[in-house]
Amino acid sequence: MDLAWNLRLLAQCARSVLHNRQTIPRRILLVGVRARRHHARCMEILTRAQAHRDGTSDAQLQRAVRRGELHRIAAGIYMRADHFRELDARARHRCAVMVATESCGPGAIVSHASAAVMHGLDCGGLRLDTVHMTRNRCSGGRKSQTLHLHPAVVPAEEVVLIDGVATTSLARTFVDLARTTPFETAVVIGDCALRRGMRRENVDASLDHARGRLGMSRARVAATFIEPGAESPGESISRVRMRDDGWPMPTLQHEIRHGGRFIGRVDFFWKEHGVVGEFDGMVKYRGDNPGRAVEREKLREDAIRDAGFEVFRWVWADLRDFERVHERFERACLRGAAR
């Protein structure tokens, strides 16, 4: 059974490479153990076996760790300490994933938060201190401080190869996280996955495959709410807060034109109220010097108002007290009604 499933998986992944490239990042895509070793070299991971082949003893490795020259990622797995310190949480998690794929052996599939990291999704709301893997079976999971091995049926069409590592597809990753994380986190992941090419029909199929599992009702709600037009985690979180507070839901990334001229694309648009909402608008001009960015943003906002719309905005700090944002929205609606 395992051999037959692995053969189907390899065939499916080959078809994904040829016909469905949008499910796999346009980075290196290699196959099998050789690919994992190549990826480990790219990340400058040193294994105990490699060190022995190069003539380095266990005692020398231990001394290098004590001197702070090497960082021990796991038993028999090392990286230069200065390089490890430079890695952010996502890159460190990828290191841990590469280690886990070797220790878990064939048949283990990177999943849940770890799959989100492998796909390059927004992971701000996820804990990255544990590697998540899924074995294609109905029982036999286990959990430690650093590894959560989930038992679950994973159809071959829900697996892709990323850097040679079997990983749950974008749709399966979203559904797994939508079942097991808060709604807000699931929406951030889902919005980002749609921007990365996740197809709604694949989400529907993954929801169908997961029938009967815990958390499916909230996963279905999240699946109906996600939108590719939310272009940042802050915009996704804002949409959730609007939903929770009973706001009329806006159109996302609406183009404003006036006199036949394109003015700009706005984050949130309420046509019936004549109101535009902008989250952290300065990010649109990242790379400009601060003074020029402020000037360009002011000119853009003036042009939107000249087109007949009221504008209000908010930043990350406002998400902690969204009632303040609601008050700005209501004032903008009143100004729009008075035009």
Task: Pin down the residues of each PLM region.
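Surface segments flanking catalytic/ligand-binding clefts of nucleic-acid enzymes
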Residues: 6, 10-33, 37-39, 50, ...
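Short gly/ser-rich loop at a beta-strand->alpha-helix junction or flexible surface loop bordering the NTP-binding
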Residues: 1-215, 334-339
